[in-house]
UniProtKB/Swiss-Prot annotation:
Binding site for Mn(2+) 2: E11, H77, E99, E102
Keywords: Activator, Cytoplasm, DNA-binding, Manganese, Metal-binding, Repressor, Transcription, Transcription regulation
GO MF annotation list: DNA binding; DNA-binding transcription factor activity; manganese ion binding; protein dimerization activity
Main location: cytoplasm
Keyword presence, Nuclease: no
NCBIfam families: PRK03902.1
Activity regulation text: DNA binding is strongly activated by Mn(2+).
General function of this protein: Central regulator of manganese homeostasis.
Gene: mntR
Location relative to the cell: Cytoplasm
Stated name of the protein: HTH-type transcriptional regulator MntR
One Pfam family in the UniProt entry: Fe_dep_repr_C
GO-annotated cellular components: cytoplasm
Amino acid sequence: MPTPSMEDHIEQIYLLIANKGYARVSDIAEALSVLPSSVTKMVQKLDKDGYLVYEKYRGLTLTPKGEKLGKRLVQRHELLEQFLRMIGVDEERIYNDVEGIEHHLSWNSIDRIADLVQVMEENPDIVKKLEASKTQHNL
């Protein structure tokens, strides 16, 4: 079971590879606002645990296990952002809120939130009622 820090690294590596075609230690460190030496230690651990293959000075690649988890972590993050947007959380708070909660929810809870988002998309009146409620509470 990966730790929250492991998840953050895998998620960033997945995003970097998806966007740039590669992920370097320096890019990961910059994206996570940590020291490159910390990333190197984590990458070595992720290599040992089978999430990626790391060769010093040659870069890294996700294994199928790492790619599958990376994709799921990105989807979780996007789902939580979508959910918070739907329930009317202020845009400038969404990213930090997602970062604060994403590692503390079980995959079962994430799946239920996905179901709820789908219900809300299929029933726009629910979202309108939430918007009206937010307006009423912000008086």
